[in-house]
């Protein structure tokens, strides 16, 4: 059969009917199967970080996405929305970002679940969003600048029995803030918590003497050991004793029974998308776990000055259990947290 280049090629009846049959089969398939070959993710990810730029969350997220972006073959684009102890960023994520699997949040589950319990914002966990990729476990600690007059945690408590000490914290609803309030209750000492909206400005406040002491997650402090000294840790064990001059646990120093207080950062996504797209969500979670185990991420994390021992991956179930535990802890300390606001 021949035809002119200016004419349409002839189509046989068999080919035409076959084409209709194939089209009909595609139309009959569920959308998820009909477009199974459409690659997810289809574009870059947009990430909200609900704290200020330049802090520990940003450093950790960027080190992580160096490995994750290669697995997903997409880049990560960040915006920073501090304020109201993280509430502003979460409300923006839940209410204004499309639940399409390409919008993520990278948050600090500990303080942000405490904020959720205390401030009672207009969104719901886990109905509106879920955490699925925990990156680390970060114990809360008390620290000072290296030339501080306070050389150990007992000297801090003795001074705070005479007058309230100013404590720089990243935010009031935070495990480290609960630790300071619980320390005050246990020892009869007094602390004035001053929130600075993120780790970086908190370090600056301690460094320039605006605050007497600081209380933050330990890994960021350990990345700045040339400037700061850890005095005590809110956990049953100080796993970094060798690089903190054997700083004691708070409970061992005072015979108290303060619960373990640690933060865990994690990726979050809209719950309705995750539940409606189980295969794509499984891809997101499995590649997150692969990225976490990769030498590239661990090398990048170490380059931030943070100790690799704190890296511990957690899936959706692990994250949900931790988040719910933080909500219960916040309810226990809600009266004193509310009094500090």
Predicted stretch roles:
Residues 1-11, 15, 19-28:
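N-terminal secretory signal peptides
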Residues 34-47, 97-102, 157-165, 303, ...:
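Immediate post-signal peptide segment of exported/extracytoplasmic ligand-binding proteins
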Residues 35-127, 172, 176, 189-215, ...:
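N-terminal (or domain-start) structured segment
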Residues 42-44, 279-341:
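An extracytoplasmic/periplasmic, membrane-proximal ligand-sensing/linker region
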Residues 68, 95-101, 116-201, 266-299:
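Hinge/capping helix and adjacent helix->loop/strand transition within the periplasmic-binding protein
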Residues 109-111, 137, 147, 219, ...:
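Solvent-exposed coil/turn segments that connect beta secondary-structure elements
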Residues 220-293, 340:
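C-terminal lobe and pocket-closing loops
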């Amino acid at each position: 059969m021949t035809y002119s280049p200016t004419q349409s090629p002839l189509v046989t009846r068999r080919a035409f009917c076959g084409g209709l049959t194939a089209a009909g089969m595609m139309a009959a398939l569920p959308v998820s199967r009909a477009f199974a070959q459409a690659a997810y993710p289809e574009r870059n990810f947009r990430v909200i970080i609900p704290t200020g730029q330049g802090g520990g969350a940003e450093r950790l997220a960027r080190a992580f996405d160096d490995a994750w972006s290669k697995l997903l073959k997409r880049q990560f684009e960040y915006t920073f929305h501090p304020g109201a102890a993280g509430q502003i960023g979460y409300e923006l994520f839940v209410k204004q970002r499309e639940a399409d699997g390409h919008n993520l949040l990278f948050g600090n589950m500990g303080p942000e679940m405490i904020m959720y319990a205390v401030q009672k914002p207009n969104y719901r966990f886990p109905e509106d969003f879920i955490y699925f990729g925990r990156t680390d476990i970060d114990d809360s600690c008390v620290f000072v600048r290296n030339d501080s007059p306070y050389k150990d945690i007992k000297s801090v408590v003795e001074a705070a029995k005479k007058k309230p000490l100013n404590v720089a914290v990243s935010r009031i609803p935070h495990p480290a803030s609960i630790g300071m309030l619980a320390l005050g209750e246990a020892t009869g000492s007094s602390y004035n918590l001053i929130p600075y909206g993120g780790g970086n400005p908190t370090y600056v406040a301690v460094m320039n003497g605006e605050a007497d002491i600081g209380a933050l997650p330990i890994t960021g402090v350990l990345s700045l050991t040339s400037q700061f000294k850890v005095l005590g840790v809110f956990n049953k064990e100080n796993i970094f004793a060798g690089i903190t001059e054997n700083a004691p646990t708070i409970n061992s120093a005072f015979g108290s029974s303060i619960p373990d207080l640690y933060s865990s950062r994690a990726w979050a996504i809209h719950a309705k998308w995750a539940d409606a797209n189980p295969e794509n969500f499984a891809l997101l979670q499995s590649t997150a776990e692969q990225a976490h185990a990769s030498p590239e991420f661990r090398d990048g994390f170490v380059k931030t000055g943070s100790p690799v021992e704190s890296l511990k991956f957690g899936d959706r179930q692990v994250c949900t259990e931790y988040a719910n535990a933080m909500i219960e802890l916040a309810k226990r300390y809600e009266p004193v947290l509310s009094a500090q606001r």
